[in-house]
Amino acid sequence: MAVEHNMQSSTIVDVLEKILDKGVVIAGDITVGIADVELLTIKIRLIVASVDKAKEIGMDWWENDPYLSSKGANNKALEEENKMLHERLKTLEEKIETKR
């Protein structure tokens, strides 16, 4: 009688699909020191996930980054316009005060 083994194999595509679907967080610290004197500490925090999963957990920084998104560039233009309008308002208020 032959014994059957249920061998499941995963391809790299299957593994990547699971990782992107669920997400993976990798955290680590690297410390360089001499004689109990800490010279350098590097904190590494890495998340690997699909865009949908990242948005689901609240990570959407790339949507407003002016270097990565047209929305971000629009926000930069709005900030500049807002700053200019504040300066203009301040100038007008000062002119009104001097006329009193």
From Swiss-Prot:
Keyword Signal: no
GO molecular function, one term: structural molecule activity
PROSITE patterns: GAS_VESICLE_A_1, GAS_VESICLE_A_2
Keyword Metal-binding appears in the UniProt entry: no
Matching InterPro entries: Gas-vesicle_GvpA-like, GvpA, GvpA-like_CS
One term under GO cellular component: vesicle membrane
Chief location bin: other
Entry function: A minor component of the gas vesicle, might be involved in nucleating gas vesicle formation. This protein could be important for the shape determination of the gas vesicle. Gas vesicles (GV) are hollow, gas filled proteinaceous nanostructures. During planktonic growth they allow positioning of the organism at a favorable depth for light or nutrient acquisition. When a minimal gvp locus (gvpA2-gvpR-gvpN-gvpF-gvpG-gvpL-gvpS-gvpK-gvpJ-gvpT-gvpU, called pNL29) is expressed in E.coli gas vesicles are made.
Assembly with partners or alone: Interacts with GvpA.
Family to which this protein belongs: Belongs to the gas vesicle GvpA family.
Protein name as annotated: Gas vesicle protein J
Gene that encodes the chain: gvpJ
